[in-house]
């Protein structure tokens, strides 16, 4: 656990050297942290991918933002959608039961928090998922 925390800190420091905004998603805690200019400015609870459809770990960038996105796979609304590296998953408003339950996306359970996160997060923001 200490190694994972150290890795996140080192990765975050490297990303901060390149960008003024970064998101860290802690899968174990089901939490999202938004940093701007090395300061924590936003925290929210999440629901990430369930056991057989996990949210992929790694480092990504926000490459697309859509206020009123509809999934082309599941044909459901995904308000305040932010796609990661052109992949078929992203961060968006959605049902949050308090545990991993999605098909891989990162769900923010409050519409107002999803809106705030969307507004605070520019294209190109780095996202670390671990």
Sequence positions of predicted segments:
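Protein maturation boundaries and topogenic segments
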Residues: 2-3, 18
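Sec-dependent N-terminal signal peptides
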Residues: 3-13
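Structural motif
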Residues: 1-2, 24, 119
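Intrinsically disordered, low-complexity
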Residues: 15-61, 126-130
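Exported/periplasmic cell-wall-interacting domains
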Residues: 19-20, 50-59, 66-130
């Amino acid at each position: 656990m200490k190694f994972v925390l150290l890795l996140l800190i080192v990765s975050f420091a490297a990303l901060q050297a390149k960008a003024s905004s970064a998101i860290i998603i802690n899968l174990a805690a089901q939490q999202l942290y938004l940093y701007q200019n090395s300061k924590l400015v936003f925290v929210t609870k999440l629901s990430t991918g369930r056991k057989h459809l996990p949210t992929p770990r790694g480092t990504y960038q926000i490459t697309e933002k859509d206020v009123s996105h509809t999934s082309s796979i599941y044909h459901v609304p995904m308000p305040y959608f932010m796609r990661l590296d052109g992949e078929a998953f992203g961060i968006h408003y959605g049902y949050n039961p308090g545990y991993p339950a999605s098909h891989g996306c990162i769900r923010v359970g409050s519409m107002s928090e999803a809106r705030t996160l969307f507004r605070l997060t520019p294209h190109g923001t780095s996202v670390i998922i671990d």
